[in-house]
Every structure is written in structure tokens, then in C-alpha cells.
Amino acid sequence: MKASVLITLAVLGVMFVWASAAELEERGSDQRDSPAWLKSMERIFQSEERECRKMFGGCSVDSDCCAHLGCKPTLKYCAWDGTFGK
């Protein structure tokens, strides 16, 4: 009786280690590939031309900022210009 319980526990332990190793191997390949994937996504977003800069976005002139935002001359960021409307 004791021997069968020990054998069962040993088999379960081996199966657990085997399954964990297989899962770690799958995740490892994803983690190695993810930096390249993130870099390609970063290039895509950097290459897009944006219509305007949103609140606190960097700017050089007022026309860089979205509607109702103006470029603050001292720190060069888009902030509310005090106007309302559509």
C-alpha cells in the first residue's frame, strides 16, 4: 500500500515537472520574440503623422496642438488656451 502511494506521488511529481518545463519553454520563446515585436510596433506608431498634439504633448508652435489648446512658450507643451466651444 505504501509503495503504491509513493509510486503514484513520484509519477505525479515527474508529470508536474515535465508540464512546467514545457510551459516555461513556450513562454520563453514568446518573451524572446516580444522585444522585436514591440520595436516593430513602436516604429509603426512613430511613422504615423498625427493631426494634432493632445494635452501636455510636446510642441513648438500653436498649430501643433489640438483645438482649444495652445503651445506654452516656456516649457513647450500643449495646454488649454482658455476657450470653449466645438
UniProtKB/Swiss-Prot annotation:
Write down which residues bear the modification named Phenylalanine amide. Answer: F84
Q: Which residues form a coiled coil?
A: none
Disulfide bridges in this chain = C52-C66, C59-C71, C65-C78
**Annotated localization:** Secreted
A Pfam family hit: Toxin_12
Q: What role does it play?
A: This toxin acts as a voltage-dependent gating-modifier. It inhibits the sodium conductance (IC(50)=124 nM) and slows the fast inactivation (EC(50)=1180 nM) of Nav1.5/SCN5A. It significantly shifts the activation to more depolarized voltages and decreases the deactivation of Nav1.5 currents upon extreme depolarization, but only slightly affects voltage-dependence of steady-state inactivation. In addition, this toxin causes an approximately five-fold decrease in the rate of recovery from inactivation and an approximately 1.9-fold reduction in the closed-state inactivation rate.
Misc. remarks from the entry: Negative results: does not show effect on Kv1.1/KCNA1, Kv1.2/KCNA2, Kv1.3/KCNA3, Kv1.4/KCNA4, Kv3.1/KCNC1 (all expressed in oocytes), voltage-gated sodium channels (Nav1) (from DRG neurons), and in a range of voltage-gated calcium channels (expressed in rat DRG neurons). In addition, does not show significant toxic symptoms when injected into mice and into cockroaches.
Name of the molecule in the record: Kappa-theraphotoxin-Cg1a 4
